């Protein structure tokens, strides 16, 4: 028993469930951002976009996809290894994957701010806004 009155397996189950709950929140944001970025490619204005804007967009889409993969992996592992007694091995790795997913999410949010700022104001102001977003994340 620990200070919360849980046995080690109970604490492990709670920690894993808390991680999965946190990932559900992050994944909702990733899915919305991914949908927005996918929709952008099918607008009339996208056809007129410069190679620079298209490059920012493509890199940002890739960053969001990587983020999604990292954030989704712990839930998939949990489902695949459910009731096989591997939680103590999976939890540290799942935590690292979650942190990587959040880092890629921060990079993709910065890319999204840069993309929108380049279209809206362009130039140095766009880079400053993206840098502010990067610092914030």
Regions picked out by a protein language model, each given a short descriptive name:
Residues 1-49, 67-75:
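Cytosol/matrix-facing amphipathic helices and coiled-coil assembly/linker segments
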